[in-house]
């Protein structure tokens, strides 16, 4: 099961925020990350991880259905690199079957 924005909002409500405040906090948090990335800035969240922009160069690709060679154009992607604290906490968890 994945954590959703609604679940984040509900968690803030349980901690004492009203519904409108919780929604504003969650939406504002993600909007600030989006705006920073759109402006070409990396996002560093101490104790959690970093969202970084990477430029991928163009490369040859292949259509998996036809086998035809097609060029894959250059693009900019967002990558997430977990911080050491997050990595060590995740490593301690047991996999769910």
From Swiss-Prot:
Keywords: DNA recombination, DNA-binding, Transcription, Transcription regulation, Translation regulation. Signal peptide: none annotated. It comes from the Bacteria. InterPro entries: Hist_DNA-bd, Histone-like_DNA-bd_CS, IHF-like_DNA-bd_dom_sf, IHF_alpha. One of its GO terms (biological process) is positive regulation of metabolic process. Belongs to the bacterial histone-like protein family. Heterodimer of an alpha and a beta chain. This protein is one of the two subunits of integration host factor, a specific DNA-binding protein that functions in genetic recombination as well as in transcriptional and translational control. This is Integration host factor subunit alpha. It comes from Histophilus somni (strain 2336). The gene is ihfA.
């Amino acid at each position: 099961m994945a954590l959703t924005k609604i679940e984040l909002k509900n968690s803030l409500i349980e901690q004492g925020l009203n519904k409108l405040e919780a929604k504003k906090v969650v939406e504002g948090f993600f909007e600030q990350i989006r705006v920073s990335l759109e402006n070409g800035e990396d996002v560093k969240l101490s104790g959690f991880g970093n969202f970084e922009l990477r430029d991928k160069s163009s490369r040859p690709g292949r259509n998996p259905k036809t086998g035809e060679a097609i060029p894959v154009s250059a693009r900019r992607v967002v990558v997430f690199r977990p911080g050491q604290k997050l990595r060590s906490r995740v490593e301690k968890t047991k996999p769910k079957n």
